[in-house]
Design a protein with these regions (language model features):
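Conserved beta-alpha
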Residues: 73-146, 153, 157
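Short, flexible loop segments at boundaries between secondary-structure elements
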Residues: 140-145, 183-214
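Proline-aspartate-enriched helix->loop->beta-strand connector
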Residues: 154, 158-168, 184
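Short glycine-rich anion-binding loops that position phosphate/pyrophosphate groups of nucleotides
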Residues: 44-47, 166-170, 193
Length: 228
């Protein structure tokens, strides 16, 4: 429906308020196109990190599909539609897309920030999305970025999808700067905690999430007072 497909703005970033099915239709079209399309699942963390990055925010406007990675973001935009909130909370689109990659034996390249995250991500595919061809994995750090080497590695593997689980603004900078030279169908930015990993040691994570939400809500209040 038209109402579902409208853009919402949260902390100056336009987000596509799509159902999982609508987002999936877009993603499937991207997989048929020769140019790399950029899908980003924004999280509270990424919105906060991008707060001061005015130039980067402009670049992000050029991404093809920007979806809310958690329900709090939709709530901040006063979205009350239960289906949208539930699908966002359940990561329905991400699961649909990963299932599609597995079913079609797509070639996927993983970007992570640590060895441990790489192992977790790889394990997640082994367990839930068998059939996906993981053709490469790279550890990317903001300190010693080697974009050329990374792009060459990706371009050498006939990649269908680059899955990025990097923190902001590293993730957004990386794709904004290199999308014109990258050979892949889809870049999917998941953010640092993007892959729904089986929860181990959830304590710290939960508390961290709680504080993050509080800070985020304060930021939203401030931006409402400023009138944007």
């Amino acid at each position: 429906s038209e109402i579902m497909s409208k853009k919402i703005s949260v902390l100056d970033i336009s987000i596509d308020n799509f159902t999982a099915k609508e987002a999936m239709q877009e993603a499937l079209a991207y997989m048929e196109s020769d140019l790399v399309s950029v899908i980003e699942l924004v999280t509270i963390e990424s919105l906060m990190e991008l707060g001061t990055e005015a130039e980067l925010k402009e670049e992000i406007e050029n991404f093809d599909l920007i979806l809310a990675g958690n329900k709090t973001i939709l709530e901040a935009a006063e979205i009350t539609d239960h289906k949208c909130l539930r699908e966002t909370e359940d990561k329905t689109f991400l699961k649909m897309f990963l299932r599609y990659l597995a079913r079609k034996h797509k070639r996927v390249y993983l970007l992570v920030e640590s060895e441990e995250e790489g192992q977790k991500m790889f394990g997640h595919f082994e367990e839930y999305y068998r059939g996906t061809q993981i053709v490469g994995m790279a550890k990317v750090s903001a300190k010693n970025r080697a974009d050329d080497m990374l792009i060459n590695a990706i371009n050498g593997e006939e990649v269908d999808c680059v899955l990025s689980a990097l923190s902001s603004p590293l993730q957004e900078e990386l794709i904004s700067k290199n999308r014109n030279v990258m050979n892949a169908r889809v870049w999917l930015g998941l953010g640092k905690d993007g892959i729904p990993v089986a929860a181990k040691g959830i304590g710290g994570g939960r508390i961290g999430q709680f504080f993050m939400k509080q800070i985020f809500k304060k930021e939203i209040e401030k931006s409402k007072k400023r009138g944007n």
